[in-house]
Amino acid sequence: MKDAYKSLHEALYHASYEANSNLSIKYIDSEELEQSSPKKLLEGCDGILVPGGFGDRGFEGKISAIQYARENNIPFFGICLGLQMAVLEFARNVCSIKDAQTRESKKRSKNYIIDIMESQ
């Protein structure tokens, strides 16, 4: 998994060097978050990054990680689809729109919070 996110990995290490801070990255398969408690996998993390991606694989696991970050005041950084998922998590769990969804997902919903631009 590390090689798939090499550019993010390097960017975080460069930032930590500039901030004179130690960095330890823990890679977590989002599908594991669908099968296990987010607390079990994320406890002890000082920040959570959900990168971009495609498809529905691990989708709800990523939402669980984002919810865990919000509820436990852990800094969160969502990139592309990761940011869209943060919007969905907030819509579902704070605004009570339980079926909030993005059109990028194959799941049907009456409440698409994020749509696809016509030019895409």
Residue ranges of predicted features:
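N-terminal beta1-alpha1 cap of cysteine-dependent amidohydrolase-like domains
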Residues: 1-120
